[in-house]
């Protein structure tokens, strides 16, 4: 007998805790709210000016007319800033008890003890816990919450902040620029290579909450770093908004891998701008796992500015009932002999919709550049849908571009073969899906791969019958 499809209340991360915040802004977006955020953070005047200019841009810019339906997103019904505690603690014992219980349930302290070089935990609008191995500090590595970096490393911060994603980039980048709070700031000095990942974990707890972290990563010449972020939120009947901005600078011969495993509840709008500048022989890797949310619109972007620069995006998107995953990648070739790879894996079930939306651009100076794109979609029933929307711009005739797209269903032959060996239809379907996503999970650190497989199995419950 087939299992009953899980109710939203079965969502593992769907619990929410009592409100323990020490400050909560009024709902709605106004100039006073923006000034209040900046004042509470004791920011320099230039940052307040940046926020106010961004707010004006947000008001002027139109909503996206493509992608998913944003008509129910009410900016006046969102709380833009919630301060959960007085400061980010470096000792787990000093984190407020209610917040600590939340992260204990999510396994954050255990994960840190096992295999992380540093960890940051953000709850609502602020980082509540941050720690990094002392030996990394001694090497000159900076890993701190973005607000602290503004106060303590202002010159370095100001040099790179909003240089990759300006406020005018799009409406949601403007919104983030006006009300940003929290996020991670990482600087890795020349020729320093980190062998273990740095991690940040983002948790929305309140109803009608907006989370607007700002992450900035700088890998100096010859440096290497792997950053992992995880995201969850409780299940509510009303919507929350997650609108982050990620800026990464990969200098000459440097390497950055940015891994995301998001598992938002299905009442969250996830509208994120991620972009990196990659210089000579630098290498940027986006590894992007998208589960949950009401609507995700996210297209990690590599701007390849130096000769020999490389960019890649490996992504998985899973859309279930009432969910739209509008995701993809952008590769902008601006220099000779640059290369990019996009591998997109999408799964839809129970009427979910997955969309691959990608742009590959070859500029006039991109002689010898090449790009390879693979889009594979697995549809698990007749109610679910998939679209592939590639857009290629070519301004140099000495480039190479390959694009392969495939949409398939679980085949009767595969099911028959597995079921003839005593495996149930549900287990057989699950095995086929696991094989489909294996190119993604094999790129994750072992602990994350185990968690991703477990999340997919949870999403698969009730797919048969």
Curated annotation (Swiss-Prot):
GO biological process: iron-sulfur cluster assembly
Superkingdom: Bacteria
Pfam (any one): SUFBD_core
SUPFAM superfamilies cross-referenced by the UniProt entry: Stabilizer of iron transporter SufD
Family: Belongs to the iron-sulfur cluster assembly SufBD family.
Name of the featured protein: Iron-sulfur cluster assembly SufBD family protein SAOUHSC_00851
